[in-house]
Amino acid sequence: SYSYESEIRYVGGCLRKILNNEKVDDIDLATNLNPSEVSEILKKNNINFYESGIEHGTITAIIDDHKFEITTLREDIFTDGRHAKVEFSKDWKKDASRRDFTINSLYADLDGNLFDPYNGKKDIEIGQVSFIGDAEKRIREDYLRILRYIRFFLNYSKQPHKEEVIKTIKINISGISIVSKDRLLDELKKLLKSNQLEKLSKDKFSIDLLSLIFPELKNIKSVINAIKDKKKLFVEFDFIFILLLMVIDETDNLEYFLYKYNISKKDKKRAYAINNFYNGKNVSKTLNELSLNKVLYYYGKQAVIDILNFKIIKTKKVDKKLLSLLEFYRNKTPPRLPIGADLLMTRYKIPEGRQLGSMLKLIEDEWVRNNFEISDKQIDNIVKG
């Protein structure tokens, strides 16, 4: 029901990755159809989709459990350094011109024919990260592009930073303060997950920029070098662990970071487990089986592994004892209190309520204190007072 001019093309990251011989995770598509036409086609073909990004022209189709973001061509009507107000378009060149870097302004039809109005393919080949058109204009449309520039530079550049780009970023860096903390953290996550992170330790300009944007990140260079030196000992670290290596110190730096940035409850728990263990304590005295068993019980296995990895990374010479502890706790299940409320009620005739809770807490405290061992006699003594 649509004319031969209606079209859909692959766009952006998936093409950039293919041309750079990388694994493709997500496939994004662009179309000159408007969102209502896209949803009509998907309905006719019984393809599930959702419209959470429809105000920006994006509909997400789900095929064989894979998500495909289909976005209508757009042009910017208004930008304020954080958001763009867009109008839907039929013009592929205008859609390309609103993107940040040449290597992201690539399109290909379903036969693989490339539409590359800003020579992004050539920039991938020579390893050059170039803003489309005027760098200052691009940055002032959305100041997050300063942080995105660092990420793409690490992943794709084989050339040094251009002097005019350095100058433009330095002039406009203060604009990053209007970008939402969630967007900044999301971009930092992508950056720290980069397999080119080692390159960052040699890039003073990028380190200085990161330190300005995220002043809570300490010792970026030394942390990356320490990870590189001990890489053979570990599985790959996740974003949160690398972040915590840079944030946790003897001060209240972590508290300040968690106040500013919204991370999940699960990740906060990991952060506090490491921080409580290391912050202002003599770690060599506390790093023993009893203390680690307590962490295992209260925080879970991941927290123990984090604490041991943290110590290994922060220590110049790796102690073999730490490596054996790491192996031991990878295979250890958290301890379980050998008596529960039901048994207390039946064995000791304690009624349900506050007294039962208090008694369970006393038993638990004694059990933890005795390295998670307690006899029936000890339980009897606690209950009978």
For each predicted feature, which ranges?
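Catalytic cores of the polymerase beta-like nucleotidyltransferase superfamily
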Residues: 1-385
